[in-house]
Amino acid sequence: MATRTVSRAGPVAQETAWERYARPALWSQWAPHIRRVETDAGRIAPGVRGRVFSYAGVRVRFTVERVDEEQRRWTWRVGLGPLVLRLGHEVTAAPGGGSRTRLTVSGPLPVVVLYRPVAAWALKRLVAPAP
C-alpha cells in the first residue's frame, strides 16, 4: 500500500471548488478523465454509491465514506476488480485568495503513481475559473 498527496491552488472561491466536488454531476466538467458519473445522489454524503466512466472505457465503482461540509473534506473508496484506491479530498483557503485543493491517494503503488499526474491535471481545473 502506498500513499501520495497532490495539491493545487487557483483563483476560484472555496465555495465554488467545494460545490464542484460535492455534486457528482459536475465531476466531468473539471476532471478530464471522467466521461460521466452514475449515482442516484445529487450530492456526496456518507454511503453514496455509484460508478465513474472514463474516456478510456474504464468503469469504476465508488462509495463515499465520509463528508464534512463545514471543513470541506471528503473521502471515498474507488474500486476496479481487486484494485481499490482510497481518496481523501479537501478544499481550503489559498494564501492571497482563491482556494487550494489537496488529494491524498492510497492504494497499490503502481496505480497510485500512475494516477498522480492525472489527478494533478484535474485538481488544477477544479480551482480554475472555467474548467
Predicted features and spans:
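Hydrophobic ligand-binding cavity/cleft-lining segments
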Residues: 1-42
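Generic surface-pattern signal
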Residues: 39, 128-131
